């Protein structure tokens, strides 16, 4: 959004300028990754959704908000570099794929599986 629109939103919400942060990347995948980075390493739960269509991400946003986990974006048959990098940094205990195999392929699921934190046996 434009700076003017951000200012209008800030004003309408009654927020001070130090309470509003802009998160941006070179594309929607990098923007989602930049936002996810604010969650920090060891985030217990993360979600991935298709980046070219919003219904699955929107449907999963309630769960993400409840669990405090970020939603990262993927393509139908590939994982953007920004998403891979951030998943490696987050190392979530659980990773939920929002969407069917018709939306997010098994190739993508297999590619993101290694980013799930390994189980640590109890002593």
Predicted regions and their residues:
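Extracellular glycan-binding segments that recognize GlcNAc-based cell-wall polysaccharides
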Residues: 1-123
């Amino acid at each position: 959004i434009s700076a003017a629109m951000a200012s209008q939103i800030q004003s309408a919400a009654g927020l001070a300028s130090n309470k509003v942060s802009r998160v941006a990347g070179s594309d929607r995948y990098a923007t989602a990754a930049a936002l996810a980075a604010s969650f920090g390493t060891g985030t217990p739960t993360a979600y991935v959704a298709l980046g070219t269509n919003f219904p699955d991400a929107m449907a999963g946003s309630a769960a993400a908000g409840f669990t405090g986990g970020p939603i990262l974006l993927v393509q139908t048959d590939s994982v953007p570099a920004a998403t891979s990098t951030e998943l490696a940094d987050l190392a979530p205990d659980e990773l939920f794929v929002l969407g069917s195999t018709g939306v997010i392929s098994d190739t993508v699921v297999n590619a993101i599986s290694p980013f799930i934190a390994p189980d640590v046996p109890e002593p």
